[in-house]
Amino acid sequence: MALIMEPVSKWSPSQVVDWMKGLDDCLQQYIKNFEREKISGDQLLRITHQELEDLGVSRIGHQELILEAVDLLCALNYGLETENLKTLSHKLNASAKNLQNFITGRRRSGHYDGRTSRKLPNDFLTSVVDLIGAAKSLLAWLDRSPFAAVTDYSVTRNNVIQLCLELTTIVQQDCTVYETENKILHVCKTLSGVCDHIISLSSDPLVSQSAHLEVIQLANIKPSEGLGMYIKSTYDGLHVITGTTENSPADRCKKIHAGDEVIQVNHQTVVGWQLKNLVNALREDPSGVILTLKKRPQSMLTSAPALLKNMRWKPLALQPLIPRSPTSSVATPSSTISTPTKRDSSALQDLYIPPPPAEPYIPRDEKGNLPCEDLRGHMVGKPVHKGSESPNSFLDQEYRKRFNIVEEDTVLYCYEYEKGRSSSQGRRESTPTYGKLRPISMPVEYNWVGDYEDPNKMKRDSRRENSLLRYMSNEKIAQEEYMFQRNSKKDTGKKSKKKGDKSNSPTHYSLLPSLQMDALRQDIMGTPVPETTLYHTFQQSSLQHKSKKKNKGPIAGKSKRRISCKDLGRGDCEGWLWKKKDAKSYFSQKWKKYWFVLKDASLYWYINEEDEKAEGFISLPEFKIDRASECRKKYAFKACHPKIKSFYFAAEHLDDMNRWLNRINMLTAGYAERERIKQEQDYWSESDKEEADTPSTPKQDSPPPPYDTYPRPPSMSCASPYVEAKHSRLSSTETSQSQSSHEEFRQEVTGSSAVSPIRKTASQRRSWQDLIETPLTSSGLHYLQTLPLEDSVFSDSAAISPEHRRQSTLPTQKCHLQDHYGPYPLAESERMQVLNGNGGKPRSFTLPRDSGFNHCCLNAPVSACDPQDDVQPPEVEEEEEEEEEEGEAAGENIGEKSESREEKLGDSLQDLYRALEQASLSPLGEHRISTKMEYKLSFIKRCNDPVMNEKLHRLRILKSTLKAREGEVAIIDKVLDNPDLTSKEFQQWKQMYLDLFLDICQNTTSNDPLSISSEVDVITSSLAHTHSYIETHV
């Protein structure tokens, strides 16, 4: 180290001053004080808060900025030669065990009281901060090349981050000290296990090698060329190179690689500096620059190994076979990995990084204009990039006003490979890729050119932003479907077969070699690629507002489930697993065994290994994978999505479950962000042919079913921005959602041939998330469509006037559903009596538990029940008594109605059980105790008029609030009216009613919301800073 750079401890006061000039702007005011006191390098490394206070740095924030930069110098000065992944793991392991010992020692003391819920002591929080600091040092290594490209280390990094975030959440939870300590002990034991795993891999040279410094000189730099480096700066002042431009000075020297850390520029230490000051230092000498780089260990002892020599690697087909390190075989059983060669294909695909563009940054003249050649390119219509105007780039801030480039509006260029490219042409030297702009800030982990862009995809992308769910299951229609729907389904089935002919292979192209992607493109497109390279440009911000036309084509209609298990090939992980089925019947089997195949971040399941079609699949990057502790079945895990649904799986043994979780996390680590951008396939698809029964209430241990079967008119199928009908290719933007008209609704009701029966089936299915996110009516309450569509489909629209149809559930369709079903009985009671003059009675407007029971009672006279006549639970609280009074007031406005209800019971045991459940009776005929949800629904059932319901609801709120305030006033009057009040009595009263006293103080004093902050928020923000950075190109 002494031969390369002078140790920081040997710095003179002038060198300390020179280093401080590159720190944050707010610290420049203190340079004179440091210069006056002649602070040397050794004093700088040992400086404390008190010494900074003596130097005039009084603000805590400024002190922290200086100390953070000094910590980086300490790590450079003392830990460079000894710091490696193994020692960092030892430090984290020691911190975790120290925290465990601290908790154990506290419990052994005689003054320990674990039942209290007071805040944790400062020494406890200090140990937590030390633990997270040790974790950050380890993450700084795992988050960079070459460790970031190895799946085993990537999974370890994600686990450490998750545990640290969990630790920060635990210390700020409101629970007893004993419970908090137990949770922290569990996290510490898990962290120790992770560290032991890393330490056990001591045979891997990546674990035991230390970082080293290397001096690189770049000369003969043209003024218009630049250095050709992409530099990422973390929040605390570490500058990491993320890539180089091809044929640039940085690329030609063959010594600068992704993951290198810039330590010095022209022998001036820049650790802790601002990015703009680093850029100015690089531009200081136009003829050349001398860089001192800190290089991470590679797979060999040299600083430029073959596999990681440069980030523009050759395609995998041209690379020599290199023996894998033992780390990958530890976490991945060989029996579950596809092994066409001796190396792990999935790991090499994660390591593969395609060539970056040659000129992502075009220097402009002093006026900010592009060169003349580029202007000529614009004149002839060539796709010319705008340079490296990354939203994170400091260098481009002065030009942002001219081009208005923000993160959403960044123009991306995608290109297709030339036809008939041979293997020799795939090399970087012979095929320079000029004119391509890397996405935003060039993340080195992902393939930025490898995705096939279909021309029709541009039209489909506008839908993708607003419709999360693309549901494409080819489920069978229930036998209650009408004949014209069956006939239409046959025609649709023939078309779907033609569309699915070409979907016999997975359609994930990210992180694939260029030659393989070329072959896949030619196989799928079936048309010759033009001789010249094709360019497609699109803007991300315009995806939400562009095409609204219906898209057609073979790619748009294909389903990923139409691939046999044999054609899918050997997956990255496969085996038998249990899958939890949606509870469609009370007595149905909840779990079923399937053959699962994990392939390219997608999970397929088949009935057996020879099945010709997958029963379902999930695109895993869109789902969160975790243990399913809420299920009673052993070794269960789940794939959940907050907007779609959750899938539950279970393995036979604990090892199998861990193997599946590890493999899924490994494969989805590199896919997550990319799949979120390019997701043109479906998130999931599943066959429902074995479950055509009506749904029933699931057991207590199972989560709520993902959808219900309440029928609704077709116009409601796109009401939610998150749900789209099956096989529907119509746009789901806000504009198209609001364009439904009364004529279209009448046309759908009368059975127009243009309406797809599959869409009608999908319109009868609503997810629980859809129910939650259903827009409110003008009165603020949810009113759900509950009547079967069959009545409306076969009713004579001419015989019943639109005034007799039921009112709406959603604001955008209120007039349509009101015309279809008739008005409320409160406003149109006489007309309803004329309409039902044959002895029939108005419909019930309460929400049924199951629409399948309506099918059974389809031919029975439909009656309207008074909402007050439902079986009500006993009122045991004053709040329920208020509801009863309000319900009686509502009954006076509604008027007299018939109390009889005539329903024809179904023949099946299930329908009988559902009828008993609706009547709040047990199977033995005894009254069943109502649940909290039924208590809540009982109030909504009081009145069918939403306006009246809103008034009653508001009255109930006001009464409850008034009663609570009266009680508080009585408590306050008890103190104020006491003429003999003493200080002791007042202190006792204040302790007894502490919450009330704090409310009074809070209302009398104005609080600044910015002043309310938690101590642990600092810990969370410091951990989050590990991943916050800005990036530029020089």
Swiss-Prot record:
Limits of the PDZ domain: 215-297
Entry keywords, A to Z: Coiled coil, Cytoplasm, Disease variant, Intellectual disability, Membrane, Phosphoprotein
Comp. bias intervals (Low complexity): 324-340, 730-740
Modified residues (Phosphoserine): 12, 338, 390, 685, 687, 756, 767, 908
CDD domains: PDZ_CNK1_2_3-like, PH_CNK_mammalian-like, SAM_CNK1_2_3-suppressor
UniProt superkingdom: Eukaryota
BP terms from Gene Ontology: intracellular signal transduction; postsynaptic specialization organization; regulation of signal transduction
PH domain segment(s): 570-669
PTM annotation: Phosphorylated on tyrosine.
Coiled-coil intervals, chain numbering: 875-904
Composition bias type Acidic residues, residue spans: 683-693, 875-889
Entry keyword annotation includes Coiled coil: yes
Ranges annotated as biased composition (Basic and acidic residues): 894-905
Start-end of Basic residues biased regions: 545-559
Transmembrane region(s): none
Any one GO molecular function term: protein kinase binding
SMART domains: PDZ, PH, SAM
Role, per record: May function as an adapter protein or regulator of Ras signaling pathways.
Pathology linked to this chain's protein: Intellectual developmental disorder, X-linked, syndromic, Houge type: A disorder characterized by delayed development, intellectual disability, speech and language delay, and early-onset seizures. Carrier females may be mildly affected.
Family: Belongs to the CNKSR family.
Subunit structure: Interacts with RAF1, RAB2L and RAL GTPase proteins.
Name this protein carries in UniProt: Connector enhancer of kinase suppressor of ras 2
Species of the source: Homo sapiens (Human)
This protein's encoding gene: CNKSR2
